Design a protein with these regions (language model features):
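Terminal accessory/targeting
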Residues: 1-4, 14-57, 66-96, 100-116, ...
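DG-centered beta-turn motif at the end of beta-strands
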Residues: 7-10
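Surface-exposed loop and adjacent secondary-structure segments within mature catalytic domains
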Residues: 61
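Active-site histidine-anchored catalytic micro-motif
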Residues: 126
Length: 244
C-alpha cells in the first residue's frame, strides 16, 4: 500500500494550521489542503512555505465563511456562504459564479505564496460535488490545471488522476489507534494507493467558534501514536505529488 495521510482544513484556524504543520514535520501527515477564503489562509500559506511543505491542495469551499468574489447567488443576506446542504441544493447557482469563485480561491493561494507555493491537488469541503453544476466546475478546472483530485463519489468517473481508494472511517467514534491498526493490516499487502482522510489540529477558543468537530487534537495525537508505534513502517507513505 501507498498511503497519503491527508489533513483537511489547513487555514481554518491558527491552531488547526499549527497542528497540521506539526504533523507534517513529525512524519505522520503527508499532505494537506487550504481553505483559501478563511481568515487564516495567508497564515497557512506562510507556514507551508516556511516549513517547506510541498504537498498542498485547494480545499474548495462554498459553504463556510465569505466568498472571495462578490456574488449574492452564493450567499445569505449577510454575505456569508449558504451552509452545507443549503448551498448544495441552491437553485440559484450558475456555472459562472461557481467557476469564478473556485478560480479566485486558487489565485488567492498563489498570491499569498508569492511564487513559493504551488498547489498539487484538489479537494472539496463538505459534499459539493453532489451538485451537478459544482461537479462540472470542479472537473473543468482540475482538468485545466492538470492536477490530481480526491477520489469521492462525484469524482469517481473523472478521467483525472486520483487515489485508488478514499478511507474516511478515521473520524468521530473511530478516532483510535485500533482503527488505524486494522486499516493498515487490511490494506498493507495490497498495491493500492489510498488516501486516509483526517481532520487533525489543535483546539483553541477561536476554533470552537467556527467548527463543531472538536476531536481534531485526538486525531493528531492518534496519528502521532501510530507513527511512534511503527504502524507506518509496514507501508509506503507518499503525498499527492506521486499522482501527477
Amino acid at each position: 500500500m501507498k498511503l497519503i495521510i491527508e489533513a483537511d482544513d489547513f487555514g481554518l484556524s491558527k491552531s488547526i494550521t499549527d497542528g497540521i504543520v506539526d504533523g507534517i514535520n513529525g512524519g505522520y501527515i503527508t499532505s494537506t489542503n487550504i481553505m483559501a477564503n478563511m481568515p487564516f489562509a495567508e497564515y497557512a500559506v506562510e507556514k507551508a512555505v516556511e516549513n517547506n511543505i510541498k504537498s498542498v491542495g485547494l480545499h474548495f469551499n462554498l459553504t463556510v465563511g465569505k466568498p472571495l468574489t462578490k456574488n449574492p447567488l452564493l450567499t445569505d443576506k449577510n454575505g456569508v456562504f449558504l451552509y452545507n446542504r443549503k448551498q448544495i441544493e441552491n437553485p440559484n447557482l450558475t456555472y459562472e459564479c461557481v467557476y469564478n469563485e473556485m478560480m479566485a480561491q486558487i489565485k488567492q493561494i498563489e498570491k499569498f505564496g508569492k511564487g513559493k507555493l504551488k498547489l498539487n491537488h484538489i479537494t472539496c469541503h463538505h459534499h459539493l460535488g453532489d451538485n451537478a453544476i459544482i461537479k462540472q466546475v470542479v472537473y473543468d478546472i482540475t482538468k485545466l490545471l492538470n492536477l490530481p483530485i480526491r477520489r469521492v463519489d462525484y469524482s469517481a468517473d473523472f478521467d483525472i488522476n486520483k487515489p485508488d481508494l478514499y478511507y474516511k472511517n478515521f473520524s468521530m467514534k473511530n478516532v483510535n489507534i485500533d482503527c488505524l491498526r486494522n486499516f493498515i493490516e487490511e490494506y498493507s499487502n495490497t498495491d493500492l494507493t489510498i488516501e486516509l482522510l483526517s481532520h487533525p489540529g489543535y483546539i483553541d477558543d477561536y476554533t470552537k467558534t467556527i467548527t463543531s468537530y472538536l476531536d481534531r487534537d485526538k486525531e493528531l495525537s492518534t496519528l502521532k501514536q501510530a507513527k511512534e508505534e511503527g504502524l507506518f513502517d509496514k507501508i509506503q507513505l507518499i503525498d499527492y505529488s506521486a499522482l501527477k
